[in-house]
Amino acid sequence: MANFTAADVKRLRELTGAGMLACKNALAESDGDFDKAVEALRIKGAKDVGKRAERATAEGLVAAKDGALIELNCETDFVAKNAEFQKLADDIVAAAVASKAADVDALKAASIGGQTVEEAIGALSAKIGEKLELRRVAIFGGTVETYLHRRAADLPPAVGVLVEYTGAGAEAAHAVALQIAALKARYLSREDVPEDLVASERRIAEETAKEEGKPEQALPKIVEGRLNGFFKDAVLLEQPSVSDSKKSVKALLDDAGVTVTQFVRFEVGQA
């Protein structure tokens, strides 16, 4: 008996963009395990798998101040453009700086205007008639470069980046912040990539090469090449620099005498 339902098949289709039969077969092969089903679909070449899985349906904005970054969600872009909603976001990120709240729960308990952040969110939610959610917060304590990006001129920022660094190269740090916003690096260095993710990518590369009919003796070289491609996509220091494609981000930073210690990227509606 199958360990999944028609609703599970529908959900996997929404996550991956693959066809109904492909999703049904992937769930059957994985005994209902969604992660394994997604991996199986990637091996078989389903388009946009993984990318759609990270998506969430949300509107809202990101706001930053003095090394703090928050994401505040609403249901429609109409509310995202609302002045009161934007002011609330500014007040919340200021509260994050003042309270040094390291997570959402701590920030919700922080004070703004004689009430908690959670109470302020609830009050505005009741007033405008939409569900509002403080989704995440990040605070860095060192020297920080901040970049906010708008998807359209009439919308508030939807992408926010914080880059903590050492060294005097503010221009290089800004270039890296733009890089992170555009190319969506997930990890600072290769060593930061979880071992289980590396193992999964290696397995996917090998199985994909086999599906393509590549000769057995060529598999190790092909797998390593594709794994290196994954690292160049996901790891900041290994990405080609957008400001100088002949150099990696690491080379750009080395030339400027800058060391990135950590970074974070928030995008509204993304995991």
Swiss-Prot record:
InterPro entries tied to this protein: EF-Ts_dimer_sf (IPR036402), Transl_elong_EFTs/EF1B (IPR001816), Transl_elong_EFTs/EF1B_dimer (IPR014039), Transl_elong_Ts_CS (IPR018101), UBA-like_sf (IPR009060)
Superkingdom, natural source: Bacteria
Record keyword Lipoprotein present: no
Keyword line: Cytoplasm, Elongation factor, Protein biosynthesis
Compartments in which it is found: Cytoplasm
Chain intervals for the UniProt region annotation (Involved in Mg(2+) ion dislocation from EF-Tu): 76-79
Matching Gene3D superfamilies: 1.10.286.20, DNA helicase RuvA subunit, C-terminal domain, Elongation factor Ts, dimerisation domain
GO molecular function, one term: translation elongation factor activity
GO cellular component, one term: cytoplasm
Family: Belongs to the EF-Ts family.
Role this protein plays: Associates with the EF-Tu.GDP complex and induces the exchange of GDP to GTP. It remains bound to the aminoacyl-tRNA.EF-Tu.GTP complex up to the GTP hydrolysis stage on the ribosome.
Protein name (database record): Elongation factor Ts
